[in-house]
UniProtKB/Swiss-Prot annotation:
Matching HAMAP family: URO_D (MF_00218)
Record: residues binding substrate: R29, Q30, A31, G32, R33, D79, Y155, S210, H342
InterPro entries on file: UROD/MetE-like_sf, Uroporphyrinogen_deCO2ase_HemE, Uroporphyrinogen_deCOase
Organism placement in taxonomy: Bacteria, Pseudomonadati, Pseudomonadota, Betaproteobacteria, Burkholderiales
Pfam family, one: URO-D
GO CC aspect terms: cytosol
Native species: Variovorax paradoxus (strain S110)
Site (Transition state stabilizer): D79
Keyword list, A-Z: Cytoplasm, Decarboxylase, Lyase, Porphyrin biosynthesis
Name this polypeptide is given: Uroporphyrinogen decarboxylase
GO terms, molecular function: uroporphyrinogen decarboxylase activity
Catalytic activity: uroporphyrinogen III + 4 H(+) = coproporphyrinogen III + 4 CO2
Length: 370
C-alpha cells in the first residue's frame, strides 16, 4: 500500500536521536474522555469496545486531538487488554469500574491452557492502524502500542485492576514457574501483535509497562524487564513503507532501573514525573554508543489543572531539566520527546492542553536559538 509522504518527521527524528528544530510533543491518552468530541463519538458507539472495534470510530477518535492541537504524533486508539481478550479471557468494561476479565488466569491449568492468540481475532486493530495511517495523509507519524508482558499478566491474573497486586505477586513468589510460562506466552503474543501493527502501517511502536514499578528490585529485572527484552528481540525493524520503526519502552515507576533499561534493544525510554530528566540524560541519553536512548516524558499530568501561566512555567522546568537540545545535524546526540509522565486525566480542561502544546513548541524553539 503506498503511503503519503511524511510532512512532519520531528517525532521520528527525535526517536533516532537526530537534531530537530523543536522538541516534539504528544500525550499519552491524547484521544480520550477529556475531549467533548470523544465523549460524543463514544456515545454513538455505545461502549468502549464498540469504539475500539469499529475502524471508522477508532480512526475518528485517534484524529480528534490532532484537529485541536499541533501534536507531533498520533497514537492508535485501542486498549492494552485486547491481547488477553483474544486469548479468550472475556474482557468487559463496566461503567465506573474499568476493565474486567470473566475468566482470569488463576492456577496451573489456566496457565497451561494459554497460548499466543490467532492474530486474526485482532484484525479490527490492524484495520484501524491502516485506516488511521491513510487518514493522517502524512500529517504526523502513527504510533502503535501494546501493554508489556508483566502489565498484561497483572490484569490477567487479578481479573481487573488492583490496588495491592496480591494475586499476581502470590503467583510470582509461590509459583515462579507458572509466572515465567505466562510471561513467555505474553511476550510472544505482544511481539506478534506489534509486528502486525507495523505491517499495517505503524511508524513507531511503544510498550507500556504501566505496572513494572510495583515490583521489588530483582523481581523487576526477572519478571518485567527480561520479558520486555524478549518482545523487543522479536520485533521486525522496518515498516510497511520500508522505513525503520523506532521502539519506545515506558515503565511507570521505573526510574530506579534506568541503567538496566539502557541495555534494552530500543530507541526511546519513557519516564514518569518522579524521574530527574537531567540525571536520566546522563545515565541513558549521553554517549555515542548504540545503546544510548532518546528520552520521552515527563511532566506530571496534574500540572494540566493549573492555570495556563503555571503550565507554561512547568513546561519550562521540564525543558530546562533535560537541558540544551542536541543541535548537530551531522551526528546523533541526546534528544527529548515531550510527554506526560502518565496518561492524561479525563477531567483535564482541553484549553489547558492547548497551552501546554503551544508552550513546548515555542519554548523549545527559543532554547535552540539561545
Amino acid at each position: 500500500m503506498p503511503f503519503a509522504p511524511l510532512q512532519n518527521d520531528t517525532f521520528l527524528r527525535a526517536c533516532w536521536r537526530q537534531a530537530t528544530d523543536h522538541t516534539p510533543v504528544w500525550l499519552m491518552r491524547q484521544a480520550g474522555r477529556y475531549l467533548p468530541e470523544y465523549v460524543a463519538t463514544r456515545a454513538r458507539a455505545g461502549s468502549f469496545m464498540g469504539l475500539a472495534t469499529n475502524t471508522d470510530y477508532a480512526t475518528e477518535v485517534t484524529l480528534q486531538p490532532l484537529e485541536r492541537y499541533p501534536l507531533d504524533a498520533a497514537i492508535l486508539f485501542s486498549d492494552i487488554l485486547t491481547v488477553p481478550d483474544a486469548m479468550g479471557l472475556g474482557l468487559s468494561f463496566e461503567a465506573g469500574e474499568g476493565p474486567r476479565f470473566a475468566r482470569p488466569v488463576q492456577g496451573e491449568a489456566a496457565v497451561a491452557a494459554l497460548e499466543v492468540p490467532d492474530m486474526a481475532k485482532l484484525r479490527y486493530v490492524f484495520d484501524a492502524v491502516a485506516s488511521i495511517r491513510k487518514a493522517l495523509d502524512g500529517r504526523v507519524p502513527l504510533i502503535g502500542f501494546s501493554g508489556s508482558p508483566w502489565t498484561l499478566a497483572c490484569y490477567m491474573v487479578e481479573g481487573a485492576g488492583s490496588s495491592d497486586y496480591r494475586l499476581v505477586k502470590s503467583m510470582l513468589y509461590s509459583r515462579p514457574d507458572l509466572m515465567h510460562r505466562l510471561l513467555a506466552v505474553n511476550a510472544d503474543s505482544v511481539a506478534a501483535y506489534l509486528n502486525a501493527q507495523i505491517d499495517a502501517g505503524a511508524q513507531a511502536v511503544m510498550v507500556f509497562d504501566s505496572w513494572g514499578g510495583v515490583l521489588a528490585d530483582g523481581a523487576f529485572q526477572e519478571f518485567s524487564l527480561a520479558y520486555t527484552a524478549r518482545v523487543l528481540a522479536g520485533l521486525q525493524r522496518n515498516g510497511a513503507d520500508g522505513q525503520p520503526v523506532p521502539r519506545i519502552v515506558f515503565t511507570k515507576g521505573g526510574g530506579l532501573w534506568l541503567e538496566a533499561m539502557r541495555e534494552l534493544d530500543c530507541e526511546v525510554l519513557g519516564v514518569d514525573w518522579t524521574v530527574n530528566l537531567s540525571a536520566a540524560r546522563r545515565l541513558v541519553g549521553e554517549g555515542t554508543d548504540a545503546k544510548a536512548k532518546a528520552l520521552q516524558g515527563n511532566i506530571d499530568p496534574n500540572v494540566l489543572f493549573a492555570p495556563p501561566a503555571q503550565i507554561e512555567a512547568e513546561v519550562a522546568k521540564v525543558l530546562q531539566a533535560f537541558g540544551q537540545p542536541h543541535a548537530d545535524a551531522a551526528a546523533k546526540g541526546p534528544t527529548h520527546i515531550f510527554n506526560l509522565g502518565h496518561g492524561i486525566s479525563q477531567f483535564t480542561p482541553p484549553d489547558h492542553v492547548a497551552a501546554l502544546v503551544q508552550a513546548v513548541h515555542a519554548q523549545s524553539r527559543a532554547l535552540r536559538k539561545g
